[in-house]
Design a protein with these regions (language model features):
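Short amphipathic alpha-helix that is part of the acyltransferase structural core
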Residues: 3-45, 62, 67, 172-180
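A generic "binding-loop/recognition-motif" signal
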Residues: 26, 80, 123-124
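Short, hinge-like loop/turn segments at secondary-structure boundaries
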Residues: 37-38, 135-138, 154
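A conserved beta-strand-loop-helix scaffold within acyl/acetyltransferase catalytic domains
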Residues: 42-64, 70-89
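Conserved acetyl-CoA-binding loop-helix of GNAT-fold acetyltransferases
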Residues: 89, 95-108, 119-120
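Conserved active-site alpha-helix within GNAT-family acetyltransferase domains
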Residues: 112, 116, 122-150
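C-terminal "cap" of GNAT-fold acetyltransferases
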Residues: 141-180
């Protein structure tokens, strides 16, 4: 992590970028940010009601002028595992380290919550590999935990477990995991 301390992500960096917790009023911005990726079938679309219901999981990256330029969420699955999801940037801000800063903030949140491992389902294998994520195959949870998780209605949990019912949504994606 390049910043230090609990409030490190609540200040603008040298490029004027601020990563902060999302507000309910950010939902239209999240929809705007994910729309190009949904159109290209890189991300699944989300209804506004789902975004409002999970807004506390999201972080927003603001550009120097205060406009939201990135979003990402951290969803906890179990006592030791969470998923980075809905990580998206305004395409003008790709390759300008905003994604790195967003991921660092979400990993910071995971550590604050006591989570030991972070999962992601991604087409951006190189990006996540640079941050220490490794490709995974079979289940990385015990049979008892699997039996609990398989009852979840959360699509992200189903993707983590690699369940057949979500296979059409995950074709071409790589399942990756990082130990914090």
């Amino acid at each position: 992590m390049t910043e230090h301390g609990k409030h490190a992500f609540h200040v603008r960096d040298d490029h004027g970028i601020l990563v902060r917790p999302a507000l309910a009023s950010d939902v239209p911005h999240i929809q705007r940010l994910i729309a190009p990726y949904v159109d290209r079938r890189i991300l699944l679309g989300k209804e506004n009601v789902a975004l409002y219901g999970s807004i506390q999981q999201f972080r927003i990256a603001e550009g120097p002028d205060g406009t939201p330029i990135g979003c990402g969420a951290l969803a906890v699955f179990w006592d030791d595992i969470a998923e980075v999801r809905t990580l998206a940037l305004d395409e003008q801000w790709i390759h300008k380290r905003v994604g790195h800063r967003m991921l660092e903030a979400l990993e910071h949140d995971a550590r604050e919550l006591g989570v030991a491992r972070i999962f992601c389902l991604t087409f951006e294998v190189d990006f996540f590999a640079k941050h220490g994520y490794l490709e995974i195959g079979e289940s990385v949870v015990s049979p008892d935990v699997y039996a609990e998780l398989v009852r979840s209605s959360d699509e992200g949990v189903a993707e983590f477990l690699d369940l057949a019912r979500v296979k059409p949504n995950t074709l071409g994606n790589t399942r990756m995991l990082k130990n914090l």
